[in-house]
Amino acid sequence: MSTKQLKRIKYLIIDVDGTLTDAGIYYDENGNELKKFCTKDAAGFFAAHQVGIQIMILTGRECAATTRRMKEMKVEYLIQNCVDKVTYIQNFMNEKNIKKDEIGYLGDDLNDLMGMSLCGFAGCPADACEEVKRKADYISEVRGGYGAVRDIISYLLKERGEWRKAISKVYEIGI
């Protein structure tokens, strides 16, 4: 994709299980579902926010751990228990008058393929299924749950020429 095309992206839709997490489902002794999120992805979220990209978490499961982590991450849109991601994305695009090329989608499995098709940019972790890898514009070298989202966002922002500016604001390191 060209820099011009990547600069159009205003929203990133991100799957949870297998993309932000390692796809494992863990339960505590009381039966509560737990998730392990990689703190490295936080830098990607914050960098995206610095350049005006809004984040939508779109997942088929509902989990209190996801709610808590996404609140900490100041995610603009948290959609859980979504059984029809395609219809949700289409409705969101219509309501907000968003064009396909203004949205990126990060996912890892078959249930993400149709959502990826609706968006102008698609990224996936290294351990995504082969069908998703074939659809992706960028395949991270990092596995889901181990910083793949940060890697994909850093790729996107580097290609747009905005990475250094974004992380400089995040970490106030003046580069």
State what each model feature region is.
Residues 2-87:
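Alpha-helical substrate-recognition element adjacent to the catalytic core
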